[in-house]
From Swiss-Prot:
Plays a central role in chromosome cohesion during cell division by preventing premature dissociation of cohesin complex from centromeres after prophase, when most of cohesin complex dissociates from chromosomes arms. Residues 270-286 have a biased composition (Acidic residues). Residues 290-303, 318-328, 400-411 have a biased composition (Polar residues). It comes from Emericella nidulans (strain FGSC A4 / ATCC 38163 / CBS 112.46 / NRRL 194 / M139). Belongs to the shugoshin family. This is Shugoshin. Residues 123-132, 335-352, 379-388 have a biased composition (Basic and acidic residues).
Length: 479
């Protein structure tokens, strides 16, 4: 241990050691440089190998693609070669047919020289369809096998047109049409029809120009020349009478209903009754009649005449519409008017339809209203609203003689009628309302219309005289 710690004295000098270390370092540096060079060369080799690998892979890909193309082309080439082989065989067969076609004239000429008749014509004649009889209504369709029959060029197919005899018959008779051989008798066969035509014309059936036929019969019957005509039925006397009977009422209606060019089509009851009259109606022993006036107005007038006490019968006051309606009733009509309107009005049968176009306010009746207002002037002035003078003493006394019980059972008192016996006041109240009464109620309750003056009359109740007030006290007013 002590020897290890002891410093040994170097036998060689220090310079020799330095040289030795320097030499060793140089050798180490040389070895390092050589190894680095070798590493660089190896790296370059690796890069070269990688590039070669990439190029080789590219070549492999291209080669595989070429191989696939070659394989596809090989299959295509195989198919082409197969088609080519079959085409060659077909060409050989076609060549054989061409050579056979070239040898056909020689064989045909040889056959003609041997037999003296063309063989194809004989074969076609033997195998061709038989002649079809056109007279047979049902040809042998099974033999034709769905084909149309053969049209022979040398056979005559006649057209069934008018013969000379039929044209002559058409000229002679106006009612008979041209005789048609095709439609005369469906049971006759075509052969019998041809024989019948020959017997009728005295020889074989011949045909004339259709243009001349059309020119001859154009005025009488406009028939096309290429169509057959059917014999017309003779018109019997029964049908002629029926046609005349049908046309007669039409002419009557036309003569009755001739109107102006601009007239409105407003139908009234007279038009409907004339329509019903045109048809012949049987007399069923039923007389239709309307009441002469409304029941309420009739009771009023009867009551007024009873209260009057005088022997003379007064004419009942009627509205214009009621008078116009009553003119149509057979009860109200005068003999002259019945004679003048005899062709319009007829007896309406039971349950026969009646016109509903009978509006009493129809604008078609202004002339009736005008005539009524002109002919019935009751002394009323439109500008003055005063009523007519009250009745005299004799009229009041005559009204007292009437029984109050009978007057109370008639009709109730309304409006301005202060007394049942005031007949003149009733008349004046009825004249004040120039408008027609619609429902047949008392004339004193009818409202004023445009025909009245512009200033409305007062609704104040008129004065009642002393005897009239005594008379009304004895009468019991209805509830």
């Amino acid at each position: 241990m002590a020897r290890l710690n002891e410093s040994t004295a170097s036998s060689e000098p220090i310079e020799i050691l330095k040289r030795r270390f320097v030499r060793q370092n140089r050798e180490i540096a040389r070895v390092n440089s050589i190894q680095s060079l070798r590493i660089r060369s190896l790296e370059s080799e690796v890069s070269n190998l990688l590039s070669e690998n990439v190029s080789l892979r590219e070549q492999i890909i291209t080669l595989t693609q070429e191989l696939e193309r070659f394989e596809a082309a090989r299959t295509l080439h195989d198919g082409v070669y197969d088609v080519k082989a079959r085409l060659d065989s077909k060409l050989v067969e076609l060549g054989n047919l061409i050579t056979e076609l070239g040898s056909l004239p020689r064989r045909y000429s040889r056959a003609v020289r041997e037999n003296g008749e063309p063989a194809p014509a004989r074969q076609s004649r033997e195998s061709g369809p038989k002649e079809v009889d056109d007279t047979d209504p049902e040809p042998n369709l099974g033999f034709l096998d769905g084909r149309l029959p053969v049209i022979m060029e040398d056979k005559l197919y006649p057209r069934r047109t008018l013969t000379a005899q039929e044209v002559q018959e058409l000229r002679d008779s106006d009612t008979d049409g041209p005789n048609c051989s095709g439609f005369e008798d469906s049971s006759i066969s075509p052969k019998q029809r041809v024989e019948y035509d020959e017997a009728a014309t005295g020889g074989p059936a011949y045909f004339i120009d259709t243009n001349t036929i059309v020119e001859e019969i154009e005025n009488e019957h406009s028939l096309p020349p290429n169509l057959e005509t059917r014999r017309k039925k003779k018109i019997g006397p029964a049908t002629v009478n029926k046609d005349q009977a049908d046309t007669r009422p039409i002419s009557l209606l036309d003569s009755k209903f001739t109107r102006k060019c601009g007239a409105k089509r407003k139908f009234s009851a007279e038009d409907d009754e004339s329509l019903f009259e045109s048809s012949p109606s049987e007399d069923d022993e039923f007389q239709f009649s309307r009441p002469a006036q409304s029941p309420k107005l009739f009771s009023q007038n009867e009551h007024a005449s009873a209260d009057d006490g005088s022997g003379e019968l007064r004419r009942p006051i009627q509205s214009p519409t009621l008078s116009s309606q009553n003119d149509h009733s057979p009860v109200k009509m005068k003999p002259q008017s019945e004679r003048s309107i005899a062709h319009v009005h007829g007896e309406r049968r039971v349950l026969e339809p009646k016109s509903t176009n009978t509006n009493i306010l129809s604008p078609a009746k202004p002339s009736i209203m005008k005539d009524y207002n002109q002919n019935h002037d009751f002394g009323y002035n439109e500008k003055s609203e005063k009523p007519l003078p009250r009745q005299g003493k004799g009229a009041v006394d005559g009204s007292k003689n009437a029984s109050p019980k009978k007057s109370s059972t008639r009709t109730p008192v309304f409006g301005n009628d202060g007394n049942k016996s005031g007949n003149k006041q009733k008349k004046s109240g009825a004249i004040k309302s120039n408008t027609p009464s619609l429902d047949g109620i008392e004339d004193s309750e009818i409202a004023t219309t445009a025909d009245m003056p512009s200033t409305r009359p007062s609704r104040r109740r008129g004065t009642v005289s002393q005897p009239e007030s005594h008379k009304t006290e004895g009468i019991s007013m209805p509830p």
